[in-house]
Regions:
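Phosphate-backbone binding and catalysis cores of DNA-processing enzymes
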Residues: 1-101, 107, 214-277, 485, ...
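Short secondary-structure boundary/capping segments
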Residues: 11, 164-176, 236, 274-282, ...
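Glycine-centered small-residue hotspots that permit tight backbone geometry or close packing
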Residues: 19, 43, 274-286, 290, ...
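A short, polar/proline- and glycine-enriched secondary-structure boundary/capping micro-motif
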Residues: 70-72, 282-286, 422-425
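Non-catalytic DNA-recognition/assembly elements of restriction-modification systems
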Residues: 430-500
Length: 518
């Protein structure tokens, strides 16, 4: 603590707050920020062909597949673009496109049906992530809202990790649906489900699974307490509607699509086009909340980089007549190639965490663990619990290790947070990784299974703490950290003087709370 305070010209002692969960979360945020900071954007150039058939135009993306003169060429950025613009232009010139059009031949035309099932029900983490996106509120605020809804008997117990129902609840689920007929926004939907009896057999679906429930089943509406709904805030009322609609969706059929993939060839160069046509709206008809600005769509956001797995997206360009013409396309048919153009893009860095995605990252932290046995130990539970994750994130913000943009809910480290990270990285590196939590959880499991005694487990734990504390005390970090602190500080507009005031306040708060560990 003194090393950090000296660097900030404060000179006061200040305890450093650490914990097996909170320090791991700090590490995740700092690592992500440094990945973004060090990322070097790479430009690339895709070639898009403009095709037509009986008056209907559509785009196709060129790829260097087998048979192309550019197959596995060093000139490529992946298989669907070039590193240099002049190489992309050379390809266009080689296609010999002359007005008004030249011919291309369809060498593959695939049509297949796809289904999109209703999502699983909300657990707390998934609800916090959704509310962060929809309402730009923190996980802590979401927890307070859903706790209020629970206390008013509007929803079931909120601090749950499960996204499914229990068999016992499924048998009585018609009561919840029946109660929702008193909720004006979904009255007709609830009545329709009851009349069709589509709730019957729900226990045989993926939405009911006793094995996936540890303490409590998913968050669902009780179908009661509607008088209390008038006394909650607008945001709370909207959160309730989101929970209700997610619940009712599982009693609706899947959305259905016709996926058409076309491959057209011109002078041995292949272009790919895809069309995704909704044939049955299914649950999407009721999924969109009444306050939403626009209807839910199933279209996934395109990445800046583009994907080699997806051909040119034509989903939003088709009317009924166009759809019928596209359906007629078959292997061996000739279509028009009017032109080709270069679309410039650039690689993009990883995204910063927002408050919702951070909660999900904590829940899914096991994915970051390479060791299979350790990964299995926290699979399905992650780091922290549904009841503590929001609190841990809030604490990191309160002690000024992390910064939360209230408008966007984006999370970034502070200068102090990065300095703490560097100190922990050099002294007790294990605290920054979920492997530590997983190994401790594994030890607890071994105690429960009788493979080791409680005394043996505590001995190993005490040994870990003692050894690392002695290691920190035995080394002089005063001069070691300055280059790291300088490097981090260069990325912050805040002067040391401002940082000094902030950190001094943080240090005072820490001493009062005695640094309770997460």
């Amino acid at each position: 603590g003194r090393t950090i305070m000296d660097y900030l010209n404060n000179g006061r002692w200040s305890a450093v707050s650490v914990g097996r969960v909170m320090t791991c979360v700090l590490g995740m945020v700092v690592k992500r920020e440094r990945e973004i900071r060090d990322f070097v954007k790479t430009p690339f150039y895709r070639v898009i062909g403009n095709f037509g058939y009986e008056g209907q135009k559509f785009d196709g993306e060129w790829r260097a597949v087998k048979g192309s003169q550019y197959f596995e060429s060093h000139l490529l950025y992946k298989e669907n673009g070039f590193n240099k613009k002049e190489d992309a232009q050379k390809l266009i010139d080689e296609l010999k496109i002359e007005p008004p059009a030249v011919k291309a031949v369809i060498c593959k035309a695939e049509k297949k049906k796809e289904k999109k099932n209703p999502p699983l029900l909300f657990n707390l983490a998934e609800l916090q992530n959704t509310c962060s996106k929809l309402f730009k509120i923190s996980p802590d605020e979401t927890l307070k809202i859903v706790q209020e809804l629970y206390e008013k008997k509007l929803v079931t117990y909120p601090r749950t990790d499960a996204r499914v129902l229990s068999t016992a609840v499924a048998k009585e689920i018609h009561k919840n649906i029946s109660g929702l007929r008193n909720y004006a926004l979904v009255r007709d939907i609830a009545s329709g489900i009851l009349e069709a009896q589509s709730y019957k057999g729900i226990e045989k679906t993926k939405y009911v699974n006793d094995k996936q429930i540890t303490d409590h089943y998913a968050i669902i509406p009780t179908g009661q307490g509607f008088n209390a709904l008038n006394s909650v805030t607008q945001t709370a009322a909207r959160v309730y509607e989101v929970i209700v609609r997610r619940f009712l969706c599982i009693f609706y059929p899947s959305a259905e699509y016709l996926k058409i993939n076309i491959t057209a060839e011109r002078l041995k160069e292949s272009f790919f086009a895809s069309f995704k046509i909704m044939t049955k709206e299914g649950y999407l008809a009721i999924a969109s909340a009444s306050f939403a600005k626009q209807k839910l769509t199933d279209k996934q956001a395109q990445t800046t980089e583009g994907s080699a797995d997806d051909a040119a997206d034509n989903d939003n360009k088709l009317d009924k007549n166009a759809i019928e013409k596209i359906k007629q396309l078959k292997k061996g048919m000739e279509i028009d190639l009017f032109s080709a153009e270069i679309k410039e893009g650039e690689t993009s860095p990883p995204k910063r965490y927002n408050s919702g995605s951070m909660i999900l990252a904590m829940e899914n932290a096991g994915q970051l663990i390479e060791d299979e046995d350790l990964r299995a130990q926290i699979k399905g539970s992650g780091i922290g619990t549904s009841a503590t994750r929001a609190e841990i994130l809030s604490k990191l913000v309160n002690i000024k290790y992390l910064s939360l943009n209230k408008k966007t809910q984006i999370i970034t480290p502070t200068l102090l947070g990065e300095m703490i990270y560097d100190v922990v990285f050099a002294s007790i590196h294990a605290l920054l990784n979920p492997e530590l939590t997983a190994s401790w959880e594994l030890g607890l499991t071994m105690v429960a299974d009788g493979k080791i005694t409680e005394e043996e487990y505590m001995m190993k734990l005490n040994s870990f703490i003692t050894n690392h504390v002695q290691n920190v005390k035995s080394k002089n970090y005063q001069n070691l950290f300055k280059p790291y602190f300088d490097k981090a500080a260069a990325n912050y507009k805040t002067s040391k003087k401002t940082a000094k005031k902030t950190t001094a306040k943080s240090g005072t708060d820490n001493s009062k709370t005695k640094n309770k560990q997460a």
